[in-house]
């Protein structure tokens, strides 16, 4: 019983790492800095309701932020998102 639960946890963690790690790697600059504009949208851990903006790789898109956690691809206005992430 305990072994099956442990193996399920290891499998779940492995899948989570396979999904998350490549996204984080693709967001890195060659010097190791993370390009926040390449991070996926992340609504965070709380259940509050804040309309925010993130860059989806092409345009700035509105999303709901929960108020805590998430990542830095989060802007209070479309203008701030465009200024930081849109390439001329």
Curated annotation (Swiss-Prot):
CDD domains in UniProt: Kunitz_huwentoxin
Single biological process term from Gene Ontology: envenomation resulting in negative regulation of voltage-gated potassium channel activity in another organism
GO MF terms held by the record: potassium channel regulator activity; serine-type endopeptidase inhibitor activity; toxin activity
Keywords of the record: Disulfide bond, Protease inhibitor, Secreted, Serine protease inhibitor, Signal
Tissue expression: Expressed by the venom gland.
BPTI/Kunitz inhibitor domain: residues covered: 37-85
Signal sequence range: 1-27
Compartment list: Secreted
Chain positions of site Reactive bond for chymotrypsin: 47-48
Positions bearing the site annotation: May bind Kv1: 39
Propeptide: 28-33
One GO CC annotation: extracellular region
Protein task: Serine protease inhibitor that inhibits trypsin at a molar ratio of 1:1.
UniProt record similarity statement: Belongs to the venom Kunitz-type family. 03 (sub-Kunitz) subfamily.
Protein name per the record: U15-Kunitz-type theraphotoxin-Hhn1b
Organism of this sequence: Cyriopagopus hainanus
Lineage, uppermost ranks: Eukaryota, Metazoa, Ecdysozoa, Arthropoda, Chelicerata
